[in-house]
């Protein structure tokens, strides 16, 4: 399945800023359905970033975040076309970022080899259980 998304200048710059903040604490970025929710390398923190305004409900997984971030910075200040090609069986696929002059394609990684994987709601709730009784503030 292949999807093509046009990302505005502002949205792409915001995406790059977020990844820049993460590159020191995460080796990978795993976006599922437009949401990046994962642990840091040392498993001491969990963070969630909503990228649905950038990538809609698509999936993008980037390994070696520091290296790929430097390549993606070449598109800052420009509208970027992103092609997401995901295979149905979970093998293969690619992510292509391009403007009118440049195109960079990343092979989709095998999820088994990613350090920082997407956390679903169930896993997050098992780590941080919350109920009405746990709330400090009331309505």
Residue ranges and their predicted role:
Residues 1-21, 26, 30-139:
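DNA polymerase sliding clamps and clamp-related checkpoint/processivity subunits
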């Amino acid at each position: 399945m292949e999807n093509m998304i046009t990302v505005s200048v502002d949205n792409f710059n915001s995406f790059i800023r977020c990844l820049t903040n993460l590159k020191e604490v995460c080796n990978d970025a795993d976006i599922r359905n437009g949401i990046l929710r994962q642990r840091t390398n040392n498993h001491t923190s969990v963070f969630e970033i909503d990228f649905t305004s950038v990538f809609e409900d698509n999936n993008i997984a980037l390994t070696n975040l520091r290296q790929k971030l430097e390549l993606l910075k070449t598109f800052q200040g420009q509208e970027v076309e992103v092609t997401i090609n995901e295979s149905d069986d979970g093998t293969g696929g690619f992510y292509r970022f391009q403007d009118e002059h440049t195109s960079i394609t990343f092979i989709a990684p095998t999820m088994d080899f990613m350090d920082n994987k997407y956390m679903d709601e169930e896993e997050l709730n098992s780590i941080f259980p919350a109920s009405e009784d746990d709330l400090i503030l009331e309505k």
